[in-house]
């Protein structure tokens, strides 16, 4: 099944992305980035780093619509960390 994921890649979406890549019945044809747990820019950076880590760097990542003045809520930052993935440096 072809799939496009729309993510604000925090911890929860990192698991969804890994599952989609690992599932033999899913053909991940793209990811769009949105805001929520993190900004679009941070989410896209997280997504691209995870795709590389998981051996799927060829999956295209597209930015969704940004919203002016969006800031990550304190609750999201406490749950997901400022970078959305618990302050883990995925690229390391």
UniProtKB/Swiss-Prot annotation:
Please name the Pfam families in this protein's record.
IU_nuc_hydro (PF01156)
Q: Which superkingdom is the protein from?
A: Bacteria
Recorded hits in InterPro entries, A to Z, give:
Inosine/uridine_hydrolase_dom, IUN_hydrolase, Ribo_hydro-like
GO MF annotation: an example: hydrolase activity, hydrolyzing N-glycosyl compounds
List the SUPFAM superfamilies: Nucleoside hydrolase
Gene3D superfamilies referenced in this protein's UniProt entry, alphabetically: Ribonucleoside hydrolase-like
Instruction: State the family named in the UniProt similarity comment for this chain.
Output: Belongs to the IUNH family.
This chain's protein is named: Uncharacterized protein in ribF 3'region
Q: Which organism is it from?
A: Corynebacterium ammoniagenes (Brevibacterium ammoniagenes)
């Amino acid at each position: 099944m072809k799939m496009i994921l729309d993510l604000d890649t925090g911890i929860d979406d990192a698991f969804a992305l890994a599952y989609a890549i690992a599932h033999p019945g899913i053909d991940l044809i793209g990811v769009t980035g949105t805001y929520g747990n993190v900004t679009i820019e941070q989410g896209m950076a997280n997504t691209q780093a995870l795709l590389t880590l998981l051996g799927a760097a060829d999956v295209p990542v597209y930015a969704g619509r940004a919203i002016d003045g969006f800031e990550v809520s304190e609750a999201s930052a406490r749950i997901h960390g400022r970078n959305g993935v618990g302050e883990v440096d995925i690229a390391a």
